[in-house]
Amino acid sequence: MALFTKAVKGTQDVLPAASYKNRFLENTLLDIASRFGFKEIRTPVFEHTELFARGVGDTTDVVQKEMYTFLDKGGRSITLRPEGTAGAARAFLEHGLFNEPLPQKTCYITSCYRYEKPQSGRYREFHQFGVEVFGTPAPAADAEIISLAAEIFAFLGIEDLTLEINSIGCPTCRAEYHKALKAYFEQYKDELCGTCLDRLERNPMRILDCKSPVCSKIAEGAPVMLDYLCDECREHFEKVKSYLDALMIDYVVNPHIVRGLDYYTKTVFEFVSHNDKTDGLVCGGGGRYDGLIEELGGQHTPSLGFAMGLERLLSVIEAQGIELPGDQKCDIYIGSIGDAASLVAAKLCTDLRSDGVSAQFDVAGRSVKAQMKYADKLCARFTCVIGDDDIAKGEVLVKNMENGEKTAFSIENFSDEFSSALVQAAANAFADSINDGDLNAADISNLFGGLR
């Protein structure tokens, strides 16, 4: 196959059969976030490289090994965003959102780019859902974004997840911790990878996040930050746990979580899958970054957030056999015999679409038999065929493709009558799901599809 007709390694095409599932997932995430008071923000796909070097941290794997960076025609160093927080923080500063009522709660779904080894649920171009809360130091905010993530997983029906939390302190208590880490890793200088030798001098905490098997094994015996927390950070962490207890959100304290980005302080957390097919996969995570806005040139603004990769989330959904709505079905296919009937079919479809109904008619000049085969491939829920006799009578028979029932509708009032019937059919199906005790996200989507 020619190079230019094949997607670049680490990227993927989302074809029509799958794109509707993606759209359902995206809409679900934004809808749940809006219930928590988050409003959508959109930022550029590329930023000045310095934003990520300063914000994400120049000793992180992301900045050192994974960013797509280039010089533009003006000689400026530009980077495709590897994550969403830095851009959202830059926008918060640039547009003076700190002058608005705080906290500012934003959310986004955005494409991100990292040069890493492609594997299941992980791509070089991926899509990230994230939320950011700017302007509050309160532990209640930490618990709220964790509860938002938990609500998403619960709504989607994802099971076998463990919420793991930790506190990685603040600059005050980290100073002593860094000394302890450095003393520990100095014993293994001859075994550390080259990158971690550099980190040993500049930021020893980053060694804890190294993917090298040797470095990871050494890091297992390293001191943990929980033993070095200052009184303020310890109190903050205890209050976060109290809120989680009050919200009845189960968690385990994992002292080894540090996250892969330098801006994190105090609370960090991850939702980890323990399903047989996705064991150990992090489905989402985040934490507090009280110093990020200040690092980017603003005033001290305690903030926090979390993110989850959509491709990874979809892989977990698939592994657990969770049904999401698939390709949107055609509500009705209107077949026709002859030119006059084709004009009527076109007009009826136009009226139906204006009323929010998914309707199609023949635009290829097919025979009636071929039209019905096409309707079957579209999985049309209802079909009808209009001929000269139907036009003369002023009504047409519509067939329910699920149960075979036929109902006569007036051509003159077709859109109103059919739309009402569609709503009733959706409501009946929804009631059946409730009675059967088998209600899921797909059923809810189908109901609202019928009510649109």
Stretches with model-predicted labels:
Residues 1-452:
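TRNA-recognition modules of translation machinery and tRNA-sensing kinases, especially anticodon-binding
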